[in-house]
């Protein structure tokens, strides 16, 4: 009976140790983060051009027959990566703070892209003339598109800062 009790306590304590130690080390976190970013880049790489590049340099989808699929894919991808990363715990508190900031920024980028997407869809699906649509889409890209680009730039800076801290 005594051996069974000691064995049970030992097994329970070993399980508690393994479950309590679910925080990532810096190198494990760096590998995980780079895997998520790599998967996102693969998802958003359409026709050989990165959407990040397209958004950073300006939305280049054309104004006469604009395509919102690229923005939808990037928006969904940002939300997906934020959802996957939100519960990650890291042993280093400074990296944890930066990680939380990164996840929050992904949600902000997702929201900015959703606003851009909705405003572009409203213009595209109206019955106005092509010239009016063109003017409205240019205005949207210079306001809402610019805000989305700034959020993406901030997101990239946080990612670079985390990678510098991990090396």
Model-derived regions: residue spans:
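Generic hydrophobic/packing signal
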Residues: 15-18, 80, 105, 116, ...
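Classical Sec-dependent N-terminal signal peptides that target proteins to the secretory pathway
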Residues: 1-22
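C-terminal amphipathic alpha-helix
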Residues: 22-68, 111-167
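Short, solvent-exposed, charged loop/turn and helix-capping segments
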Residues: 72-106, 120-122, 158, 163-166
